[in-house]
Amino acid sequence: MTVSEKIFSKASGTPVKAGDFVLANIDLAMTHDITGPLAVQGFYEIMRDEEEKKVWDPSKIVIIFDHQVPADSINAAENHIMLRKFAKEQGILNYDVYEGVCHQVLPEKGHVLPGDLIVGSDSHTCAYGSLGAFSTGIGSTDMAAVFATGKLWFRVPETFRFEVEGKLPERVYSKDLILHLIGDVGVEGARYMAAEYAGSTIRSLSIPERMTISNMAIEMGGKAGIIEADEVTEAYLQERIPGYKLDPYWKSDEEAKYLDIRHYDVSDLEPQVACPHNVDNVKSVSEVEGTKLDQVFMGSCTNGRFEDIKIMADIMGDEPVAKGVRLLVVPASKTEYMKLLKAGYVEKLMNAGAIVEAPCCGPCMGGSFGLLGPGEVGLATSNRNFKGREGSAESFVYLSSPATAGASALTGEITDPRKV
C-alpha cells in the first residue's frame, strides 16, 4: 500500500486502494477568517433541526485568523467577531490575529502528525504533508459537513511519486526544486493525485524546506503532497510533543502501486523562476535576468520561515534595497518573527529599507496590503502568480526562492543569486 492508502484505510476502518470511495473520519479540521464564516453558516443550516447545535468534536477543530489581519475592512472585522463567538460557544481553539499563517502555525504548535487525515478550507492545506499527513483543501460547504459529523467522503487518490536525487547546488533551494517539478509536469500533471516526494534529496531537506515542497503540491493539481516521515520529522515533533515516537508504519510499502514515477537528478539545477501568469511557466533565472522590478515580497506559507528570511538577508548583507523597489518582508508566524528579531534580522532588514510586517498572509491573497498596481512587476516567494493574485490584473508576478528574491531586491531586477 502507499502511505495515502494506509491513511485512508485507518480513517475509514477498512482496507482500501486507489479508486475506492470511502467515508473517512477526520483527525483535524482547520478553517480561517476568509472561508470560515461560510462554513459556520453551513454548519447551522445542517443543524437547523437539531436541539443541540454542537460540532462533532471541538478538540479536532482549529480556527485561525491570518488572511485579513488585523481587520482591514468592516466586513473583515465582522467576520472576526462571528468566528470568535462561534469558537467560544463551541469550545474550539481559536488562534487570533497575532499568531500567523495557518500552514505555519498548525505544524509549529504540534497539531499535525504522520498518518493523520487533515482537511482545511484553504487550497494549500497540502502543506501538512511535509510531516507525513494526508492533508487536503476542501470548500466551506464540505467543512460545514465536517463540523457537524467529523466525516467526509473521498475517492482514494492514485499516487504520483517523484524520486529526486543529487545534492542541490549552492544557492539553489527547495523552492527551485518544486518550481522545476511543477514546470515539468504542468499545473494538471498530478490532478487529484497524492504527490509523493521521495529520494535522497528530499530526505536531506529540513522540515521548513519540506514544507515549501508540500505546500505547492496543489500547483501541479495534487490532492496532497506527502513526504514520508523519518528521523527529521521525529526530531521536529519531539520539540513540540515531549516523548513523541515515530511509528514506522506511515510510509509506502516497497510493493506499493503508483500511477506514475518520475526520476530527477538536481545536481545541476539552476535557480528557477515561475513567470506570469501561471505557476508552471517556469524558466531558469538566466532566461529572465534583468527584468525590472517594482516590488519584492518575501514571505507567505511557502517561504516565510526563519530559514527563508535568513537566506535572503544573508545574501543582501549590509547593502540597501535598490532605489525604486519596495521590499516587503512578512514572517509566517509570531514564533518565526521572534526568531528573526532575536537574531537581529528584523533590524538589519529595516535598516536596508525593507518594510517588515506582522505575521499574516500579506500580499499573497491580493486583498490586503502591499498590492501591485497596473503595469507594476513583482517578484514573490509565495505560491501563485495568476492575474490579479497580488493586486491589479494588469500587474505581473514572478515567483522565486528567497535567495533569488534577496539578490533581486539589491539590484532592482531579477538577478541570479549565484552572481551576488
UniProtKB/Swiss-Prot annotation:
Query: What GO molecular function terms would the record report?
Result: 3-isopropylmalate dehydratase activity; 4 iron, 4 sulfur cluster binding; metal ion binding
Task: List the CDD domains.
Answer: IPMI
Q: Which residues bind [4Fe-4S] cluster?
A: C301, C361, C364
Q: Name one Pfam family in it.
A: Aconitase
Q: How is the cofactor bound?
A: Binds 1 [4Fe-4S] cluster per subunit.
Give cofactor(s), names only.
[4Fe-4S] cluster
Q: Does the keyword Amino-acid biosynthesis apply?
A: yes
Q: Which PROSITE patterns match?
A: ACONITASE_2
Keyword Iron-sulfur belongs to the record: yes
Q: What processes does the entry annotate via GO biological process terms? A: L-leucine biosynthetic process
Q: Assembly and partners?
A: Heterodimer of LeuC and LeuD.
| Role | Catalyzes the isomerization between 2-isopropylmalate and 3-isopropylmalate, via the formation of 2-isopropylmaleate.
The protein here is known as Probable 3-isopropylmalate dehydratase large subunit
Species of provenance: Methanosarcina acetivorans (strain ATCC 35395 / DSM 2834 / JCM 12185 / C2A)
